[in-house]
A protein has these predicted regions:
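Short aromatic/hydrophobic-glycine micro-motifs
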Residues: 40, 92-94, 140
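A polyampholytic, Gly/Pro-enriched intrinsically disordered region
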Residues: 82-96
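Long, charged alpha-helical interface segments
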Residues: 149-169
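Generic structural signal for hydrophobic core residues of well-folded globular domains
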Residues: 10, 38, 74-75, 91, ...
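Conserved RNase H-like, two-metal-ion catalytic cores of nucleic-acid enzymes
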Residues: 1-86
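A broadly conserved amphipathic alpha-helix scaffold signal in soluble, globular proteins
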Residues: 52-55, 85-89, 122-129
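Residues that form generic nucleotide/phosphate-binding pockets
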Residues: 34, 57, 87-91, 134, ...
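Acidic, Mg2+-coordinating catalytic module of metal-dependent nucleases/exonucleases
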Residues: 96-156
Length: 169
């Protein structure tokens, strides 16, 4: 298991806050308050992995979750590509580099790594907004919301090391 090194947060106003965690104790009480707060929407892209890391290392639930990968798979059934890079290109019309996706984020971050981290979150609000429009138009919003309810259970199954699809025959 890779350690949780950093968390990126954006309010959707082109800002990005990159929080590097103290891996000796993972003490981040203000961050935990934000993550647990039901009044603050947390938008992820493939939240399953991130939420598992957060729960494992920060010992907190992440509440009021949205997930652009799940939304994309339900809204964009015309496509097999649901990567964040693809969604940024389709909805924001920007090509972002994923060169630093597999980087060491545990040390001092270079300007290029910081830009990569920021790009990972600054577009999520707009993408979520656009995907929500499609989900509503295609009458799949309720299905999406039900998937989000199950996401925490899927995370708990992952943390309990149930790697098999328990729904398969």
């Amino acid at each position: 298991r890779d350690p949780l090194c950093l968390i990126q947060i954006s309010s959707g106003n082109s800002d990005a806050h990159i929080i590097q965690l103290d891996r000796s104790n993972y003490h981040a009480p203000n961050l935990v308050k934000i993550l647990a707060n039901n009044d603050i929407v947390k938008i992820f892209h493939y939240g399953r992995a991130d939420i598992a890391h957060i729960k494992y290392y920060l010992k907190t639930e992440t509440n009021n979750i949205q997930d652009t990968k799940i939304a994309s798979k339900l809204a964009r059934s015309y496509s097999d590509s649901h990567s964040l890079k693809t969604l940024i290109k389709e909805f924001i019309n920007i090509d972002v580099s994923k060169q630093f996706q597999s980087s060491d984020f545990g040390g001092e971050l270079s300007p290029s790594q910081l830009k990569y981290c920021a790009n990972d979150v600054v577009y999520l609000h707009k993408i979520h907004e656009e995907l929500s429009k499609i989900l509503i138009r295609e009458k799949r919003l309720d299905l999406y919301n039900e998937c989000l309810k199950f996401l925490k259970t899927r995370v708990d199954l992952d943390l309990a090391l149930f790697k098999d699809d328990i729904w398969s025959h």
